[in-house]
Amino acid sequence: VTGVPEHHLLISMCEGLTIANPRGGDNLPGVAESWEISEDGRTYTFYLNKNALWSNGDQVTAQDFVWSWMRILTPSLGSQYPDMLYYLKGAEEFHQGKISNFSDVGVSAINDHELKVELKNPTPFFIRLLSHYSTYPVHKETVLKHGTIDDRNGKWTRPGNFVCNGPMNLKAWELNKQIIVEKNPLYWDADRVRLNEIRYYPVSNESTEDRMFRAGQLHVTNVVPLEKCPIYIENENPNLRIEPYMGTYFYRINTLHPVLKNKDVRLALAFAINRKQIVEKVSKCGQAAAYSFTPPGSAGYEPDTDVPFNPELARSLLADSGYANGEGFPV
């Protein structure tokens, strides 16, 4: 699982130790109702909510997190986000096969309701990481009933099989048509869940989704066609709400490539991109040009890097690398 749409779906059905605060600020308690951090910032003790249940009635325990994190770090699973847990002592070594005993990894169950996590180094943002779906627990018995710990195609995620611990349960999954989730009456905070059902539609075309929203076929959409956004902003469309989105869109460069491993070549590519023109002439919906991976304003962070559009410098760097006027540069 990877991507923003999948994230929205998963947070409706699953819950980790903490929950992202929708109003910003520190994460809120999830399965963990409280936690303690050691003075050196390396040891966390989480106290789990005794009312936290799986959708089949089983209690969510500390051991569920231990097993689930072991699953994510199992190399043969091929998880997309094992590095989210690399902050744990021994996690990276286990995932890379350098150690084989998971008891050497910094997560353990003190008892059913206390989870101990040991980090390699102090990590001030660790609590925030715990709202990411890669750290969510999965129901061990259900996973193993329908496959193995590293089975990527097990049927444990199918309707009727899936056991979750979040506000919603999986009701239906019709491929390329819709996914329906319904209120989970066993969720520990069910009284505050206002929706009885959510239907997710896999609309691949932005214009189609926009028309569906304007026709009343969708209650919510976070997609606005590029050509429509400036019009909606200019006309002050009451249905348009723009909120800060902490996301960064970027090109990923293979630094092992014979050409791209040259730092000057990579700098040339960076100086050749007119970020300001992209957000002003292409996306046109209030985006900010990205000059750093971490968005400005993240927990008070302000980037001190700047890679302005400079085609002359880009050409010079390419020439110095043996690609004058771009000749010989692989495309």
What are these regions, as identified by a protein language model?
Residues 171-182, 199-257, 267-268, 276, ...:
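Extracellular/periplasmic solute-recognition and catalytic clefts
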